[in-house]
Amino acid sequence: MDLQAQLEELKTKTLETLQSLTGNHTKELQDLRVAVLGKKGSLTELLKGLKDLSNDLRPVVGKQVNEVRDLLTKAFEEQAKIVEAAKIQAQLDAESIDVTLPGRQMTLGHRHVLTQTSEEIEDIFLGMGFQIVDGFEVEKDYYNFERMNLPKDHPARDMQDTFYITEEILLRTHTSPVQARTLDQHDFSKGPLKMVSPGRVFRRDTDDATHSHQFHQIEGLVVGKNISMGDLKGTLEMIIKKMFGDERSIRLRPSYFPFTEPSVEVDVSCFKCGGKGCNVCKKTGWIEILGAGMVHPSVLEMSGVDAKEYSGFAFGLGQERIAMLRYGINDIRGFYQGDQRFSEQFN
């Protein structure tokens, strides 16, 4: 077969092969281009035969070679566009959306477990005749410490690592300042004061499984005539039973808080083992739940309340601790990390 016939055959076969390549043959198209037009391709091999032609025939065949090269080059370019378009169309078809189908329902949010816990506790106190009082998170040193019987040089201030903004302004370490402000304004001629102050508090703790630089407290205060330790115990027993069940009992242990005298730590009988001893109660049968005590006379006197005529009790508990005990949560950081897998457990 002469060179011209070989060129025509190469052109015909190449064009036929190109027509068969679709969107799924991108690699085959590239391989064919290299096999025909590459440095070692079929057309290049045919060009080597030009040197064997006569002087009259060489220009004619050379022109034919250039025409075939130009034709095939354009054919490859056009087919490449067709292959790419087919590939894109196949992807669009595979990912097509039926716009007539109903859309996905929006995911409904729900209250955070700490919000749920706080509202449950507040409902208990409202049912017992307490009022809910909010206060400032940024507080004066005077109300946060001095009004709680903690003067400037009191060593017990070291019990609460504090975030100071200025020498006299700080992030409150407890919600007790709300009690002091409310005590200043209360009219005892209209009856005793019964209040709780929920809110966020701040301490310079290193965050770990059981500590956080911010957490939530609910502190309670009752002041009136003839308020006794028995009233405190009865109130706490009712609160604990409503939160953890009627079968629970409490135990009071002597403790120290500058703003109460006497002061106690309150334990609740273990709700997991019933007091027999387990990993939750550390084999003691009891779980420490909150601190409480009778309001120190100095705290009353600083609010202009006659400590000889009036007495009271105070207590404080943490929402995180209550939630961790109720739901078996072992890491306080889960409340603040925004992990939806954690939050959805309490939906």
UniProtKB/Swiss-Prot annotation:
Cofactor note: Binds 2 magnesium ions per tetramer.
Any single Gene Ontology cellular-component annotation: cytoplasm
Molecular function terms from GO: ATP binding; catalytic activity, acting on a protein; magnesium ion binding; phenylalanine-tRNA ligase activity; transferase activity; tRNA binding
Cofactor list: Mg(2+)
Localization terms from the record: Cytoplasm
Membrane-crossing segments per the record: none
Catalytic activity entry: tRNA(Phe) + L-phenylalanine + ATP = L-phenylalanyl-tRNA(Phe) + AMP + diphosphate + H(+)
Gene Ontology annotations of biological process type: phenylalanyl-tRNA aminoacylation
Predominant localisation class: cytoplasm
Alphabetically ordered keywords of this record: Aminoacyl-tRNA synthetase, ATP-binding, Cytoplasm, Ligase, Magnesium, Metal-binding, Nucleotide-binding, Protein biosynthesis
Family annotation (Gene3D superfamilies): Bira Bifunctional Protein, Domain 2
EC number: 6.1.1.20
One Pfam family of this chain: tRNA-synt_2d
Annotated positions binding Mg(2+): 261
Taxonomic superkingdom: Bacteria
Complexes and interactors: Tetramer of two alpha and two beta subunits.
Family named by the database record: Belongs to the class-II aminoacyl-tRNA synthetase family. Phe-tRNA synthetase alpha subunit type 1 subfamily.
Protein's name according to its UniProt entry: Phenylalanine--tRNA ligase alpha subunit
